[in-house]
Curated annotation (Swiss-Prot):
It comes from the Bacteria. The lineage of its organism: Bacteria, Bacillati, Bacillota, Bacilli, Bacillales. The gene is ytlA. It comes from Bacillus subtilis (strain 168). It is found in: Cell membrane. GO terms for cellular component: plasma membrane. This is Putative binding protein YtlA.
Amino acid sequence: MNRWLRLGFACVGSIFLMFALAACKQEETLTKVKVAEVTHSIFYAPLYVAESKGFFKEEGLDVDVNTTWGGDKTMTSLLSNGSDIALVGSETSIYVEAQGAKDPVINFAQLTQTDGTFLVAREDVEHFDWDQLKGKTFLGQRKGGMPQMVGEYVLNKHKIDPHKDIDLIQNIDFANIANAFASGTGEYVQLFEPQASLFEKKGIGHIVASFGEESGEVPYTTFMAKQSYLKKNEDTAVKFTKAIYKAQQWVENHSAKDITDAIKDEFDDTDPDVIETSIERYKKQHSYSPDPLLNEKEWELLQTIMDKSGELPKHIPYNQLVNKEIAEKVTSEK
């Protein structure tokens, strides 16, 4: 009897060992990809959906996402090989190119296609008009970044000179803007979600307008990599883009509640109701790109916005910094 028991335990042990070895082998075959994200935001929901739904692993990728907090740090991480892919505003690739980069940074997959900020007023405004900003203190975003440039573009569109008609504050770090407004600085502020919805819920402020709706479609946040990386790792870039495209389609076809359930673990310090409200706002204004394609019209609007805010170092042709072939290949496959 003992002999049969020992034999049985040995067989069971062998089976477990086989499964363990198979799992290890699968892990070993996954291609590692290091991604630097400019900030950790509900605005990037499709990226987290790709992780939570296993779309990256389906493509044979082990993706490690690291938040690098700011465009400069994100680009430094990419250029110094601290990361393989960066998720950041497309304007950063233009800045790098204008400095004479020997290894250009190429945009290959778009994640968000509108600005993600909202105009929040301290006082509740029943009938908001942009003229109401004139003479008021406006807590803006960092100079040279996409939020600030889009903000100025929209203000100018409404005949408001941001440097003459309002008291513009731009010397507060991105991470401290919301706290500054909550502490009493400014009568208006430009905020991303979920902070905008959270302020409404707490009665700190009131959303009165969307910069994303006002500015039109731009390559606001894009996956990019050095040209040399894309040449050496084209297959990996294609697989990465496939996973993102799956996630984009999933987000496009699911409710804000479903998306919240998929990504809420990424934001465990945020009320799920606030996450859902934030996602609903972004879906309503089509901020989440339904596919990874970055078209030339969006690219040109980006440079128009940069030019009007005085931040465009020089005009860069679309084909010079955009690889459209990867996204086209992925979206054309059945």
